[in-house]
Amino acid sequence: MSEAPPLATEHLTRVVDGEALVEDVSIEVRAEEVFVVFGPSGSGKTSLLRLLNRLDEPTRGTVYLDGTDYRDLDPRTLRRRVGWVPQAPTLIEGTVAENVAWGPTLRGEPVDTERLHDLLDRLGLSGFADREGNRLSGGEAQRVAIARTLFNDPDVVLLDEPASSLDAAAADRVESLLADVMEAYALTAVLVTHDANRARRLGHRGARLQHGRVTATGDLDTVLRASD
């Protein structure tokens, strides 16, 4: 019997005011891969991502984590297992270390400072632990947001165009460091992007989304050719 994928959707649909934002989406994300959800603005990419960790409720269909229907998981467990990195970072008041350790601190868990510093090092933030979060550049703040999500040790990471709000140089650096840390930690991720070059740099397989529906899925060449 084959092992269940870390994340899969089955006929996932969300309808709001009669409009299908996401319609009948069935995908599988394999272990240790970056699965790209590709498509133009307004195609339903972020709407799909919000369904994957139940920030929004599906009208029909569901999501499975390692074969378990995510409706059977309590919200706190689900949020921990499925991490989210938004387009624009929102940091709490405090130091970089306090931001990264925010999740374990809220849960009353001990903070693994060695792992925290290793994560900062891998994201190009060596020596940043004691800096105030409100004194960082946009690229630095986004890397802290990535570190905060990864420090929770999620099973799957959702990346909602994590470099789209940055200038070209900062975006390139974030993407390069993100690719390195994803490989180093053997992470499984879903990346939303409208940028074909970004998809090729970071992704392994993917799906093309148009008007909320999957129009192509599989290897990235197939998916990106479908958008030409």
Which residues does each PLM region occupy?
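ABC ATPase NBD coupling module
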Residues: D69-G83, L106
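Helix-to-loop junction immediately C-terminal to a conserved catalytic motif
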Residues: N53
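Conserved ABC ATPase signature
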Residues: E132-L136, E140
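Helix N-cap at the start of a conserved alpha-helix in ABC-type nucleotide-binding domains
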Residues: A168-A170
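Conserved ABC ATPase "signature" region
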Residues: V111-F128, A179
